[in-house]
């Protein structure tokens, strides 16, 4: 059943992309840029498997009473650094935690708690999301991990990270491989020292 629905969806998308209107192709409606209709529909139904690690921590205990809701994120790189913006409306700064790990991972977590229900209250609609959220990002090597600054304003958490100068960026460490005779020579020389 799911295969048939996906086939119909893709055939329809291909047909729509080839139909011309007075303004050009309808393929602009099929764009997958963030915020486009197709992108939102696609991401709601089929999340990017490579982004799952950014949203759900491996060690997170599952609490069935509280849903995990992701915070929407924008991340831009400028000449001076990186700026990460998360939408977290209704949260105070003491309800949000920002962690930076030595391995270059930035983690933002928090919880939006549901309002306490009072006796006699009758809810007509509950649409706002509640629960824990968690986002984690693998930062590039050019980020100064000591430069992390954050501010929370109008429901948007903005995290600024400064770039390191090119000469301070640590590249991968090259490991020398010893030949077998080098190992034998080291062993025999260490044995002779012990005698």
Curated annotation (Swiss-Prot):
GO terms for biological process: cellular response to hypoxia; response to heat. Transmembrane segments: none annotated. Residues 62-180 form the sHSP domain. Coiled coil: none annotated. The keyword Endoplasmic reticulum applies. Induction: By heat shock. CDD domains: ACD_ScHsp26_like (cd06472). InterPro entries: A-crystallin/Hsp20_dom, CS_dom, HSP20-like_chaperone, Small_HSP. GO terms for cellular component: endoplasmic reticulum. Gene3D superfamilies: 2.60.40.790. Keywords: Endoplasmic reticulum, Glycoprotein, Signal, Stress response. Residues 1-21 form the signal peptide. It is found in: Endoplasmic reticulum. Glycans are attached at residue 160. Belongs to the small heat shock protein (HSP20) family. May form oligomeric structures. This is 22.0 kDa heat shock protein. It comes from Arabidopsis thaliana (Mouse-ear cress). The gene is HSP22.0.
